[in-house]
Amino acid sequence: MRDSTAQPLAGAYNICYLNGFQTQPGADWSGDRGSALLRDESGTPVADADWPDEYILDPSTPSQRTTILQVLTPGLNRCAANGFDAVEIDNLDTFTRFPAIERAGAMELARSYIALAHGRGLAIGQKNAAELAGIGRGQLGFDFAVTEECAAYDECNAYTGPYGPHVLQIEYVDNLPAPFAAVCAAPDRAPLTILRDRDLTPPGAAGHVYQQCP
């Protein structure tokens, strides 16, 4: 998985990352674009408490969704132009974390991302949000799922049920529920399950961890 500005890795199945429901750090959401940001009662954009340099997008209305797509579509275009095989859309679950966001609007934005990806020859994956996996696969039309720490939170069946083998499972070394060999032996783990360090450091760097279940 790589950012839309990166180049895919030769010989691999490459997934391009897009933050579809929150802003990317440093992205320009000033001017008219600011109408698509979720705001609190004082009018201040709402940030993700865990990622304070990311602000929450509000897809509740058609005009807000249009603005979001105007900003995000170029990134999706880069994914296709750079030769990626698929794209994963992060933070689908913002409407479950921020009640001011309308669920219907979030679902419509997801459908738009799916249509745009398929129209460019890209598969598209749901990122996390286990409680939405059935809807994501059955109603929205995501092709696969990417789950972080489903073993740690006992959620893997929620993904492998709707998506079958089309699940990429990522566990992190600082939050393993059991030795990684035991995670690999679990009957509900995804066919492609990997262990990473939390900071996703590159090979050769201090703290780098990468293991894959056989």
Task: Give the role of each language-model region.
Residues 1-214:
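Glycan-processing catalytic domains of CAZymes
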